Amino acid sequence: MSTQWYPHENAAASAAALADAVAETLQDALDKKGQAVLAVSGGRSPIAFFDALSQKDLDWQHIGITLVDERIVPTDHADSNTGLVREYLLKNKAAAAHWIPMVADGADEAALADSEKAVAFALQHYRQPDALVLGMGGDGHTASLFPQAPQLDKGLDPAYAEPLLHTSPVTAPHERISMTLEAVAATPAVFLAIQGAEKKAVYEAAAAQASKTYPLSFVLNHKKVTCHVYYAN
């Protein structure tokens, strides 16, 4: 368990530095095995990072892009992380990347009503990332591992065999598909992007010890994980 802290004066500088670091990690994977997989988080915070990364000179046709977690909603829904990544990351040079889906294109709300079937689809397409970029909510959640979610224990269980699971946040909308703690820990390069004093305080509490109050704490305190934290004031 360890963390590396990279502070920046503003969000633009942090996003640019994170894009540089992720691009370097992907290039290393390409050099070693000819292909690479990156998992990213959704929300509005990563948009500047997505834009910066999309302009990097990489062999994008041999890079797969997927999600750390997804809302179980149609991919054209306003809350879909898939739609966000397609709009802001899979453009410019990164338009040549291979998309690894979590939710099937064309599946409507009725088709997605069975969450376990939705997870089964995601598992069929899952590829272990070489790098992933996590976010953190003000409640200490990361991916879709939320405090109080009934599936949190399963998502944190090192004995749980699958890399993805269905979660039902108590404090956020939509059923979710999320990478598990062990799938995150199996990723060679783990990045975390946070911004502002409020989230810094939550991060510091999470880094102090593993607690279900802050699910991110299990990543930060995992013996296999070195988490590279990009912080913007």
Language model segments and positions:
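Ligand-binding beta-strand-loop-alpha-helix segment within the catalytic cores
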Residues: 2, 61-133
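Glycine-rich N-terminal segment of FAD-binding domains in flavoprotein oxidoreductases
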Residues: 31-54
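Glycine-rich beta-strand-to-loop/alpha-helix junction loops that act as flexible
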Residues: 40-45, 134-138, 195
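A glycine- and small-aliphatic-rich helix-loop capping segment at beta-alpha/alpha-beta transitions
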Residues: 52-60, 86, 147-156, 208
